[in-house]
Amino acid sequence: MKFKYILILSALIGQILSLSAREVTSFNEGWLFKRGPFSQDPVKVAAQWNADWETVNLPHTWNAKDMQVKADAFYEGVGYYRKTQFFGNELKGKRVFLRFEGVGANTEVYVNGKLVGMHRGAYSAFAFEIGTALKLGAENEIMVKADNASRPDVIPVNHNLFGVYGGIYRPVWLIITEQNNITVTDCASPGVYITQKNVSKRSADITVKVKLDNGSLTPADLVLENTIYTQNGKKVTSHRLPLVLTPQGTQTYISTFKLNKPHLWQGRKAPYLYKVISRLLADGKVIDEVVQPLGVRRYEIVPGKGFYLNGEKYPMYGVTRHQDWWGLGSALTNKEHDFDLAQIMDIGATTVRFAHYQQSDYLYSRCDSLGLVIWAEIPFVNRVTGYEAENAQSQLRELIRQSFNHPSIYVWGLHNEVYQPHEYTAGLTQTLHNLAKTEDPDRYTVSVNGYGHAEHPVNQNADIQGMNRYFGWYEKKLQDIEPWVKGLEEKYPWQKLMLTEYGADANLDHQTEYLGDALNWGKSFYPETFQTKTHEYQWSVIAKHPYIIASYLWNMFDFGVPMWSRGGVPARNLKGLITFDRKIKKDSYYWYKANWSKDPVLYLTQRRNIDRERKHTSVTVYSNIGTPQVYLNGKELTGIRQGYTDVHYVLDDVTLEQGKNTIKTVATYNGKEYTDEIEWNYTGEKKRSADWSENKEEHAGW
């Protein structure tokens, strides 16, 4: 059976190669895996090396559970993956590559015992050419050594803000090309870079830069053809460039185009995508081909006024997203990515900060198609060691080159909440800014910290200044957001400012009506009602101040933090609007959906705060379909008032009956009746002693 399988696979590869010059196939099935800790190097101890392998398919992580259930009790270290693969003689004269989309965190790849490449960093892709190490007509062993132990020279330098899951947690691809190709190993990028200038409704100047590589010892007469197609596949324009490709390193070739009356990429309103196909031809035959998206758009930030897309004011309703899921860790399929994006679209968000690292390229591609405006960043976070500068630059270069053609990306994130020593952090941030501008002069850069004053030395080292402000949670009172933004607006009107994180934790098992204006996050009680109160007020302030160019609530989903134990749940950040398992949407989710989305929303809050503490209470309704009617035990209540925004409705001094109370709200919109209903239980007055003490300190990176 094994020989039959090899023959079938060999025939299949041969058939594929005869049909297409470049073949990209999944390399994710049938891996063997073993995890440490190891008392000795298992590669050097035959008995240890040959025993106890587990069969796995990729994506895979060894931390799917232990990083999520107990604080500081997870495995970080080495894991090995092995895969035996037959490569037929028909590959003679071809070039063979392996492309890894993401391995946590530091990787060595071996083919038949030979080291073919090393990579440092958990979140960017990397590609190695393996052809010279292969034995054609035979089985070959691919071995991957992954290590997610923290290192001072690789960012992130710790697991403090989020866990770096170990393993080959994103897909792997086998790539086969001719000797002359569009380069595969330029930081694992597509090898094609599309830039746009002078974008308007009248015209746009498009430049397509292609990097070619000759893997032989002979110059080749070739033709490079770059063609732009409409979304429906109709050819718009094309350019052919005859060339002689020498075998002396990667060569760069450029085609320029002017698109007249281009169909613009207009965010969620109209995310129109052209397609650019770069083809390499020899003797009239296509020997390589790469397809990339082209969304024709122009981003502009005007201090004090807002964000503009193609000259039109564009609302920046922002959320953030960590990539891990409960029970899966970071080993996600496209199904999980699509689910997360569906929730982000449903809430009405227009922009996403994918934090705090490069995320799946599939995710960025979907954002291109959905019209979401994207912030992409590197994991330079939390702490510095003085040894990470080279790796930070490497990861930024990889992020930019791999993600260069995504029209959804408007900004490159350089750092997040990196503190002492300030001079080192500021200097490295400036270096990263300069690198980003060299690689991509047309996009913005941003750096982020928790210092809320512009004159701090780590500020003002990028195009955009991001500030994480957790008023009422980590610092001061939740209402202090307004004097903060007013002060900056008056003192620094020229500043491009974004509120890059804000919010509060919410454990759904914790509920209360007794709410102050600040919560002691060091205690274990994290009520959902305080999170709701925080978002209600703070979004209302943000919405009134265009000086805040964009705001990004923290976070769309609860996520794992393996070094934490807070709010009654170990290894968890509870600031999400949706629970870690993606099953429950918190009240705050519907607050933003009512404010942002065009879909009808009618929602009663505090549905989990069932056991009421007060006989005289209030009822809150979110409605973007007009003033709702509210009923208590079948009787209509009067005196409804407008709250912080025009979707916020409050009824004060509602008197509950002893026992079960049914609250119902009704609204009619476009001839359709909408309803929502919840139940509360009142059994007598209850007093709660809670620590609502105000934190006088400035937020500094928790």
Where are these predicted regions, by residue range?
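Bacterial Sec-dependent N-terminal signal peptides
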Residues: M1-E23
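Accessory beta-strand-rich segments of carbohydrate-active enzymes
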Residues: L32-P37, E76-T185, S189-G191, G215, ...
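Extended substrate-binding grooves/exosites of carbohydrate-active enzymes
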Residues: T55-V69, A149-P152, L161, Y165, ...
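Beta-strand-rich binding/interaction modules
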Residues: V111, K201-V244, Q251-Y253, T617-G639, ...
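Signal that preferentially marks extracellular ectodomain short beta-strand elements
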Residues: F128-L134, I254-P271, L651-V654
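Extracellular Ig-like/FN3 beta-sandwich strand-entry sites
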Residues: G137-E139, S203, P219-D221, T250, ...
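Extracellular and select intracellular beta-sandwich modules with Ser/Thr-enriched
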Residues: I168, T237-H239, Y253, I287-V291, ...
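Short, solvent-exposed loop/linker segments at the N-terminal edge
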Residues: Q196-A204, N609-K615
